[in-house]
Amino acid sequence: MNQSVNGSGMKRMALINDLSCFGKCSLSVAMPILSAYGVETVPLPTAILSTHTADGFGDYVMRDMTNEMKAFAAHWRQLQIKFDGICTGFFGSVEQMHFAKDFLRDFAGEDTLVVVDPVLGDNGALYGCFTDEYVQAMRALCESAQLITPNRTEAALLAGCGMDAPVETLLKALTVKNVIITGVRRGEEIGYCARLSGHYVEIFKPCLPQTLHGTGDVFVSALCGELMNGKDMPRALTDAAEFCDKCIRKTEKRGESHWYGLAFEDVLKEERDL
């Protein structure tokens, strides 16, 4: 039974990421946003967490899903499922990244959009749970992508450059065809610097004094939604950045704790006139 498309011809995207059950990030953000873009989402959780990992929630519970990932993929392989898009995020181990490379080999067709959001670190440092071997495995996974979306710290780690390397240097050092570096600071602004099919693109917005948890997940989800609806990468970047900025402003207006997540639901509701 070939399940390359669903009955309506709707685009289908596999999401390989963690599921934080409480708090807004990763799969709990990607699934509703992509659904609002008219994209069927197929989650493949790398881990399930009681909450996201920000300090506001204290000690969280986490369950590794490596064995389940392999079993789910084996069943999907029997069904001959193919995907129009595949987006990866957090991995709990090098083993999971090796699995992801095999998953791309088995489930991506010639026209499948492959996006890797290489979760590695932030604020100039590798996350404490990761190792140099993990960085090397992420580098190898990125080679299979048409587009990667690292923040500035992750871009430096992938490129093997110092944390103070200019963004232009990072973009030249990264060999993936399309790269969007997120969270780039410029004075009182923050934004995106990209190399898309050889062309440099940048977008900046006013910077808030606090960090908002899950902003990158909201951006990547909207970016995938734009791309899956046929927009070219520069236009998709522009529109996804605008969507993310609207979510930030809505979160400001609500006065929600910045560590909880963005009020993206308000923007989806407003844009669909509900």
Regions found by a protein language model. Name each.
Residues 2-116, 120-123, 128, 265, ...:
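Conserved N-terminal subdomain of the carbohydrate kinase-like
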Residues 21, 200-214:
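Short pre-catalytic strand/loop immediately N-terminal to key active-site residues, enriched for Gly-Thr
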Residues 120-123, 155-156, 208:
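A short, flexible beta-alpha/helix-coil linker loop
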Residues 128-201, 210, 234:
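Conserved phosphate/ATP/ADP-binding segment of small-molecule kinases
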Residues 209-233, 237:
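Short, small-residue alpha-helix embedded
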Residues 234-274:
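Charged C-terminal helix
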